[in-house]
Design a protein with these regions (language model features):
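ATPase nucleotide-binding head domains, primarily ABC-like/P-loop NTPase cores
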Residues: 79, 83, 94, 214, ...
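Alpha-helical coupling/stalk and coiled-coil linker elements that connect catalytic or binding modules
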Residues: 1-266, 274-275, 279-303, 326-327
Length: 448
């Protein structure tokens, strides 16, 4: 189950107690910065961790200028003056070398500190603590890292003269005594061994954020349901499904008992939008445990693949037809694994009618094997008769009354029975001679 599924009780509390949710969101918002995404780089990238021998060398070099100055005062030997100058020069080089390395962390380290700080506040709330009961111990284990990272001087706003003077003297101390270089080296020793715990905190904070977002998202929907598993005899079921991005979307219902779905109908009638609604609902069910329907039931572990809006590629030298051929080939390969939901729209538009119908029939028969479910739309009503034993047939249709074209967007059983494409051209003001010639051509082609 997804992380959302196992935390439905928390979602229920967030939905019923909006004041609590608002308070939690105020804490979450404190990490609402474009630099926050850079925290992920601390979890995966290779970091400039100094070797222990180099770290010990830094500890020795930080005392060379002071020791040289002391020995110069005691002995008055010019050699110790040269040693002090060389030591200061070496420390200066090492300081700026380390400072250059740390520029890559100018954004991520401050945001990591902010993440740890805000996560500690969230962990004090019983509801948030129930997201990850181990998080308190993890945060406690990161206190030493947090203190070490807090010593970073990753940059400072020089807003007035006093701050400028303070920064100048601090930078001198860091340059000559390697304070910053040593501190950052020790911090990255700690960081390298704490990445898994940092990732756990990152996931904790992110999951709390997601739960609040899902709670608000559900409230914005006209209605929703939780996904379920198919009842006996069912292979797929959805009741009153709608697309969340379509205002006043007309809902539709379909239940399958072993077959797939082939949808016919004219353009703009709702075929593609319905198929997209199925895909969006299944994705939301898997990721957010939220369905845009009164009820939504599908087989456990069902995976989604679609070929709805494909384009040619000039850069890759692929035509629309070749792009579609390669995509459908991948889907056929996936179909052998079984338990897939395939969504297809207008198969093989880039070839002639006879071969398009023949190829589409063969492909659609192949895809439904191994317990796969297919939702496909087509203008080729010939496919309905070829696939009637393997697919449940549905259609969308338009209404033409008094020269006005309208759609009800309701899914209806059976294949489409009327052809209104030429009628739509007439309504849209095409020249009458074009319309009449089209009607004549229909009669001729139907006799071929």
């Amino acid at each position: 189950p997804s992380a959302i599924t196992v935390h439905e009780d928390i979602l229920h509390t967030l939905s019923s107690d909006t004041t609590l949710r608002s308070d939690i969101q105020k804490e979450l918002k404190k990490l609402n910065h474009s630099d926050a995404c850079s925290i992920a780089s601390l979890l995966s990238a290779d970091h400039p961790v100094s070797s222990h021998s180099f770290y010990r060398l830094l500890r020795v070099l930080q005392f060379v200028p002071v020791l040289s100055l002391g020995l110069l005062y005691v002995t008055s030997s010019v050699w110790f003056l040269w040693l002090m100058l060389v030591g200061l020069l070496v420390n200066l080089i090492l300081h700026y070398r380390k400072k250059t390395e740390m520029q890559a962390y100018l954004f991520s380290v401050p945001q990591l500190l902010n993440l740890l700080k805000q996560s500690e506040k969230l962990a004090k709330r019983p509801l948030c603590l129930s997201v990850d009961k181990e998080i308190t111990g993890v945060l406690a284990d990161l206190i030493s890292l947090r203190k070490r990272l807090a010593s970073f001087r990753m940059g400072i706003r020089l807003e007035n003269d006093l701050v400028l003077i303070a920064y100048f003297f601090t930078e001198l101390l860091n340059m000559f005594f390697l304070l910053e270089a040593i501190s950052t080296s020790r911090a990255f020793f700690l960081l390298q061994g704490k990445q898994q715990k940092i990732e756990q905190v990152f996931r904790f904070f992110g999951l709390v954020d997601v739960l609040c977002s899902v709670s608000m998202f559900r409230e914005s929907l006209p209605y929703h349901s939780l996904p379920g598993r198919c009842r006996e005899g069912e292979s797929f079921h959805v009741a009153d499904i709608y697309h969340p991005l379509i205002d006043h979307c007309v809902s539709n219902t379909v239940t399958l008992h072993g077959k797939s779905v082939l949808i016919t109908g004219s353009n703009m009638s709702g075929k593609t939008s319905f198929i997209r609604s199925i895909g969006v609902c299944q994705l939301a069910a898997e990721a957010l445990n939220t369905c845009f329907a009164r009820s939504f039931r599908y087989p456990s572990g069902m995976r989604l693949a679609s070929a709805i809006h494909m384009e040619d590629s000039l850069l890759e030298g692929k035509s629309f037809f070749l792009q579609e051929v390669q995509t459908i080939k991948e889907m056929i390969d996936l179909s052998r694994e079984g338990n897939h939901l395939f969504l297809l729209d207008e198969l093989f538009k880039g070839t002639n009618t006879v071969e398009r119908i023949a190829i589409a029939k063969a492909v659609l028969s192949a895809l439904i094997r191994q317990r796969n479910i297919v939702f496909v739309s087509t203008h080729d009503i010939e496919l309905a008769s070829l696939l009637k034993d393997e697919y449940d047939l549905y259609h969308f249709c338009e209404n033409v009354e008094n020269g006005v074209l309208s759609f009800d967007y309701k899914l209806k059983p059976g294949p489409v029975t009327e052809r209104n494409a030429i009628r739509i051209l007439e309504i849209c003001g095409y020249p009458q001679e074009v319309v009449q010639e089209a009607y004549s051509a229909v009669g001729q082609t139907s006799q071929l």
